[in-house]
Amino acid sequence: MRKELCRNFQRGSCRYGENCRFLHPQQAKPNNPFGFGTQNQQQQQQQQQQNSSNPFGFGVQSGGSSRPNQFQNTWSRTASTPTGGGAAASTQQTGKQTQPADHKCTDPAACKRVMQDDFKNERPMWKLTCYGHWKYFPCDVTGDISYEELRAVAYEEAKRGIPLQSIVERERNLQNSKIAEFENFLRNPYKGSVTANQSPFAATTPSIFPQSSQINSPSPAFSGFNQQTAFSNTNAGGLSSSGPPNAFASFNQQTTFPNTNAGGVSSSGPPNPFASFTQQSNNQQTAFSNTNAGGLSSSGPPNAFASFNKQPNAFSVNTPQPVPSGPSGFQTNPSTTFKPASFGPGPGFATTPQNNNIFGQSTPTPATNTSQNNQTAFNFNVPVASFTAPAINTTNTSSGTELQIGGDPVDSSIWLKEKWNPGEIPEQAPPDAFV
């Protein structure tokens, strides 16, 4: 007994479902949900196999087996040199090993090969573009113009009445100039760039120590090794001096600082406030004048930086030129000349009975020898009470360390010691020079 089809089921409004007395035919869903195209049974089976093996629904499968690494990108550019041009740095596939592009920008030859390979294999169809041979470097060829911009300019020129032939000629010249720019860069890729062995500042700045001989004086103040300075051979007072005294060693070079006497004046100028550097000893020029223990020169003015025991300068080789003696510039009656402490127990301030002043005396009186003068003992190890303290007479003996207090000579070496041994502590009060 055949049942009739349920009309309500065909309309989609049957309320009985499976309990309905009429037939509810089961319609097979079409394989093509869009309703176009035909598929046979074999194609349906293949589609089912693909749906089971490939859930993404694309790719060709054979025999129901999945292909390994089906999403792996195995594309590689076949080139002899690594890439580095307008495209991003790609990787080369060798089997299953991926190697990054080896681009050595420090090697000009390698960079040029990369550029040649880029121009050969990756030259774009649109010529009005820019180019950079390395990913993170600035563009080597700049000035890119898009075709939209070129078209917009052509429209604007056409609106202004410019002939079409002129517009085309301008665009052709623009393209030819860009091609020429690329070719020039390929021939000379590093024009205008700074290499590792080239300084960006090509112009050399003049040195204050010129190599050419500018001054005839051969003695330097500090060792200059055959170099001459740009300073003139003058003294500190601005007056020229033709003498070649050396301040701190000489290797037959030009002085770094002006060649002067210590007073800053020439040999015929006013008195020298700090004595002269140009005293001679053993036929050699010394950096400091030869003085006795009192710090006064026997043949010249008082020297603030006196050499001791008449020892010549070990670095001096120049022939000395004696400078006329001059008294100390900072003097009163009696005047005290500032002198550094000696290596021995000698005094540092010397009192000379002179009345010369640096500001009014035209003819200096030469300083007398310390064997005929009394000096004030002073040492830098103790503080200075006053520069105007009353002078204490000293007697220049073999040791040079005796003071006369109340007419009696007193050994002053005991006051120069840093540490006293038992039994050496003096009973009397220290002299004013050591207070």
From Swiss-Prot:
Listed under GO biological process in this entry are: mRNA transport; protein transport
> What ranges does the record list as Polar residues composition bias?
63-77, 205-320, 328-339, 351-374
Q: Where is this region: Disordered?
A: 25-105, 205-374
Q: Which GO terms describe its molecular function?
A: DNA binding; zinc ion binding
Alphabetical UniProt keywords: DNA-binding, Metal-binding, mRNA transport, Nuclear pore complex, Nucleus, Protein transport, Repeat, Translocation, Transport, Zinc, Zinc-finger
Which parts of the sequence are annotated with region: 6 X 2 AA repeats of F-G?
A: 2-88
Question: PANTHER family in the record, alphabetically?
Answer: NUCLEOPORIN NUP42, NUCLEOPORIN-LIKE PROTEIN 2
Domain topic, free-text comment? Contains FG repeats mediating the translocation through the NPC by interacting with transport factors.
> What is one GO cellular-component annotation here?
nuclear pore
Q: Record's Gene3D superfamilies?
A: Zinc finger, CCCH-type (4.10.1000.10)
The listed locations are: Nucleus envelope; Nucleus, Nuclear pore complex
Q: What is the lineage of its organism?
A: Eukaryota, Viridiplantae, Streptophyta, Embryophyta, Tracheophyta
Skewed-composition ranges (Low complexity): 39-51, 78-99
Taxonomically, which superkingdom? Eukaryota
Its subunit composition reads: Part of the nuclear pore complex (NPC). The NPC has an eight-fold symmetrical structure comprising a central transport channel and two rings, the cytoplasmic and nuclear rings, to which eight filaments are attached. The cytoplasmic filaments have loose ends, while the nuclear filaments are joined in a distal ring, forming a nuclear basket. NPCs are highly dynamic in configuration and composition, and can be devided in 3 subcomplexes, the NUP62 subcomplex, the NUP107-160 subcomplex and the NUP93 subcomplex, containing approximately 30 different nucleoporin proteins.
Q: Which protein, by its recorded name, is this?
A: Zinc finger CCCH domain-containing protein 16
Task: List the C3H1-type ZnF regions, as residue ranges.
Answer: 1-27
Spell out the residue ranges that the record assigns to sequence repeats: 34-35, 36-37, 56-57, 58-59, 343-344, 359-360
